[in-house]
A protein has these predicted regions:
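Catalytic or ion-coupling anion/metal-binding cores of large enzyme and transporter domains
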Residues: 21-320, 325-344, 349-371
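Single conserved hydrophobic/aromatic residue that forms the stacking wall/gate
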Residues: 1-20, 372-373
């Protein structure tokens, strides 16, 4: 699931990591005039020449890291590239592990403890992962009957530093992690930095600490992982806020946001395509808080709205506005983005009552969001 772009794409069009989101970004940018249709089509043809999912810390790999950290995947399974010969050996190990689990009567609920969920949350936070991981963790906790909530994630995200330079926040990919030893090296690094609970049982039949006992530290000279003292950020790129706009919570991804506080005037939309048109017509200005609603689970199955966040990533707006929604966003989205706003608009959540011009403020480290005048 790792891509390398073909030759011939202009360096200023496609730089760094190549992902399956590039075609969507290019289409959005072409729609608002930030690149030509010809340039967009060139990216669509050449950005994704290989099989699999994108190789960055977006939704796909966020969940892979979470599952390995929670103990439901064999060591290194989440970081072996899709077309690597090691995948066949991994499949053979899975068969043997299944037999071992059956013989020892180890069941999912023996592994899925509160501590295991904390390990998963810490790992995706330290890796700079996607907000979609929050949805999956909470859904799995509910299914397993484990008391682990958005409030727990809020505390973890506040206290977990970012120790990895995965794209989209940095230049590295999962293939880079694979080259330095895979996900076990990342997890051993987190364990050595006091961030993981090594006593948790895993699908190997051993504890997490036992699985990682012989894993070496990150090799000298690598630039993917840093120590806790030299962290990229003292708190996670994901943060959770509550307030009169989101009484049941809203999840932020703010990797490119320097100030954890933001205040701006609402500009409201009910369709992501209207945001693309508004950007094209220059109707959105710096300092705005873009509200996109009626896209939650009840309203429309909670779709991903990358076309909207991609359109807002034009230079004159990038890092200068906030985006709030009851929808989901892609893990490659960047900026000040708050999603999963609850209650959603379709069930009468406060986000449905927002009007253009309303003043909205949020403070990520205080965990608060709200309308200035209620």
């Amino acid at each position: 699931f790792f891509f390398q772009a073909e030759d011939g794409i202009r360096d200023d069009l496609v730089t760094g990591v190549q992902t399956c989101a590039l075609p969507i970004y290019s289409q959005a940018k072409a729609a608002v005039g930030a690149m030509t249709q010809e340039e967009s089509q060139e990216i669509i043809r050449k950005a994704c020449p290989g099989p699999g999912g994108c190789g960055i810390a977006a939704s796909f790999n966020t969940w892979g890291l979470a599952m390995e950290a929670i103990g439901l995947m064999l060591p290194a399974s989440s970081s072996i590239p899709a077309v690597d010969p090691e995948k066949r050996a991994e499949c053979r190990r899975v068969g043997a592990a299944m037999v071992n689990l059956l013989q020892r009567n180890i069941r999912p609920r023996d592994i899925l403890t509160v501590a295991a969920f904390r390990n998963a949350a810490v790992t995706i936070a330290a890796a700079g992962g996607s907000t979609n991981g929050v949805l999956h963790i909470l859904a799995l906790a509910r299914e397993a009957g484990v008391d682990f909530t958005l409030r727990d994630l809020q505390q973890i995200f506040r206290s977990t530093p970012v120790l990895a330079s995965f794209a989209p926040r940095g230049p590295r990919t999962m293939v880079d992690l694979h080259h330095i030893g895979g996900t076990p090296v990342l997890m051993k690094h987190l364990l050595d930095n006091g961030l993981l609970d090594g006593s948790c049982l895993t699908v190997t039949g051993q504890t997490l600490a036992e699985n990682l006992r012989d894993v070496p530290p990150p090799p000298a000279g690598q630039d993917l992982l840093v120590s806790r003292e030299n962290c990229y950020k003292p708190f996670a790129d994901m943060q959770v806020c509550f307030g009169n706009l989101a009484p049941e919570g809203i999840v932020f991804k703010v990797s490119s946001m320097k100030d954890p506080r933001f205040t701006g005037r609402a500009v409201c939309f009910d369709d992501p395509r209207d945001i693309v048109r508004a950007v094209e017509q220059r109707r959105i200005t710096p300092g705005s808080v873009i509200i996109l609603r009626y896209l939650g689970p009840v309203a429309s199955g909670m779709p991903e709205v990358l076309i909207a966040t991609a359109a807002l990533a034009v230079p004159e707006l990038d890092g200068k506005i906030a985006f709030l929604s009851d929808a989901r966003v892609s893990g490659v989205s960047h900026g000040a983005i708050g999603v999963h706003c609850a209650p959603e608009a379709a069930v009468g959540g406060p986000i449905a009552c927002e009007e253009d011009g309303d003043e909205i403020s949020f403070d990520l480290l205080e965990g608060e969001i709200g309308r200035a005048h209620v």
